[in-house]
Amino acid sequence: MRLTTVQRRFLVSTKAKVSGASISSTANTGSASAGAPNGQTRRRRRITEFKDALNLGPSFEDFVSGRAAGFTVVDPLEQMRQDREEYKKLPKWLKVPIPKGVNYHKLKKDVKELKLSTVCEEARCPNIGECWGGKDKSKATATIMLLGDTCTRGCRFCSVKTNRNPAKPDPTEPENTAEAISRWGLGYVVLTTVDRDDLPDGGAHHLAETVIKIKQKAPKTLVEALTGDFLGNLEMVDVMAKSGLDVYAHNLETVEALTPHVRDRRAGYRQSLNVLKRAKETVPSLITKTSVMLGLGETDDQIIQTMQDLRAINCDVITFGQYMRPTKRHMKVVEYVRPEKFDYWKDKAKEMGFLYCASGPLVRSSYKAGEAFIENVLNKRKQDNKRI
């Protein structure tokens, strides 16, 4: 019988390792009887495990007789190739330049000095250079993450740190944040928070206080708040909606069928819809907004159903972006959606009556948020003037 290359490699490596194991075992017999140190104990354990693996595998007779075909013997080089293929190559349309520019470095410096956290940095947003580094500061957008940089939840797509008991909120944070915003002269700012299920109010009053102080120090700055679901406590949604913000955002993240696999178990698709619905009911003039990631294995029908659910509660703005795996510990990318498909969903959103839709591989929930807001407010005013 003629052996294959894989089988020959297996036999050669097996023979060498067994010979080495026997010599090592013989050499260590005397010292072992006198009380083996930890290092020798570990070596003996490895030898035993190796012998067990050999006993479970095919014998020389199995190879000669042809019975070895029933055993799975993987070439180590082939296994390495298979592992590499699991990680899809990043398409060219997802590659971005290194962040730079005077405004970018100034924002970065101020954030560090005032001990603020930004989701732009914590979530490794690919658009940080574009949002922070523009020449016109009035069109720049910064997303400040309040209540610390540690979340009490563990969604499978998110790179933000997690802990059941994060540090207590910084009472000076609302004032520091407002000071930073007024110093930067930004036209639009997004406030977001980690989920703080450890706090009785989920951090709603802390976030609302920050909005109020920003409006006092920088009244011309438009404020968007991207909140959590407050564990379904709609009274906390009321607190946020009445704080004076301009846009109330809460992300669905994905379609209903994938929600249990993508988001933390304490989050829920219907629970998130209720947050957006309540915000609009509390302050009808508020622009409500959500974001959905693509590339997680969702179908077109599921996306359309999600959009229909959002329009049913009068959600105004939706954004679509490509899911990008932050680290190997996070869920894998199922598909890199092509730019043309994102254009399709943008057209579909307008067709369904959304006030605005930002859709593209690198789009995130706060991507060019100021530009989107201004454009849509102007469009809405034009429509109102025509009716008059």
Curated annotation (Swiss-Prot):
InterPro entries: Aldolase_TIM (IPR013785), Elp3/MiaA/NifB-like_rSAM (IPR006638), LIAS_N (IPR031691), Lipoyl_synth (IPR003698), rSAM (IPR007197). Its main location: mitochondrion. Pathway: Protein modification; protein lipoylation via endogenous pathway; protein N(6)-(lipoyl)lysine from octanoyl-[acyl-carrier-protein]: step 2/2. GO terms for cellular component: mitochondrion. Disulfide bonds: none annotated. Pfam families: LIAS_N, Radical_SAM. Residues 134-355 form the Radical SAM core domain. [4Fe-4S] cluster 1 binds at C120, C125, C131, S366. Residues 22-39 have a biased composition (Low complexity). This is Lipoyl synthase, mitochondrial. It comes from Candida glabrata (strain ATCC 2001 / BCRC 20586 / JCM 3761 / NBRC 0622 / NRRL Y-65 / CBS 138).
